[in-house]
A protein has these predicted regions:
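N-terminal leader segment of winged-helix/HTH proteins
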Residues: 1-31
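Short loop/turn motifs at secondary-structure junctions and domain boundaries
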Residues: 18, 84-85
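Short histidine
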Residues: 10, 17-18, 35-36, 40, ...
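C-terminal regulatory/oligomerization modules of transcriptional regulators
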Residues: 2-8, 104-162
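Residues within the helices of the helix-turn-helix
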Residues: 52, 71, 91
């Protein structure tokens, strides 16, 4: 279990030190691992907000990796953790303004993969997203501002192995 007071010390020592001033290099320092953008996707598109929801998202992230990535994303200012419940011990994560700024990146990665790789995303969904980029991004921002956690994209079978 993670507590807000425990994270403060950990986060302070995990600052990103870019290898260069290149914007792509800096972006990859923050988001270039296998899991970070999937966590951002789950917050943004699926409305997930708890540790347990991320664990059950289907990609099979290990608990130690998830904890590490959540800490790194929080330290980078991409997500924030808030205490929830009567005692504040349960943590809910949400995107910051910096994090929701990744919406175009997530959308374009989804569309790129659908164009160039075999995915389980329905063709109709891909066509809708591709033809309505601006509206989809506007809706993403609206939901973020209103803390609307309903899934942006309807659930579909997203596990190729299942």
């Amino acid at each position: 279990m993670h507590f807000a007071s425990d994270r403060i010390t950990i986060i302070q020592v995990r600052q990103v030190h870019p290898r260069s001033g290149c914007p792509v290099s800096i972006s990859l320092e923050l988001l270039g691992d296998r899991w970070s953008l999937l966590i951002v996707r789950d917050l943004m598109v699926r409305g997930y907000q708890t540790y347990k929801e991320f664990l059950l998202s289907g990609e099979g992230i290990a608990t130690n990796i998830l904890a590490d990535r959540l800490q790194k994303l929080e330290a980078a200012g991409i997500i924030m953790a808030e205490g929830a419940g009567d005692d504040g011990r349960r943590i809910h994560y949400r995107l910051t303004e910096k994090g929701i700024g990744l919406a175009p990146v997530v959308l374009e990665l989804l569309l790129w993969a659908a164009r160039h790789e075999s995915t389980s995303a329905p063709c109709g969904l891909i066509d809708h997203l591709a033809g309505n980029r601006e509206a989809v991004l506007a809706e993403t921002w609206r939901r973020w501002r209103n803390r609307d956690l309903t899934p942006l994209i309807p659930p579909f079978r997203d596990q190729a192995a299942n």
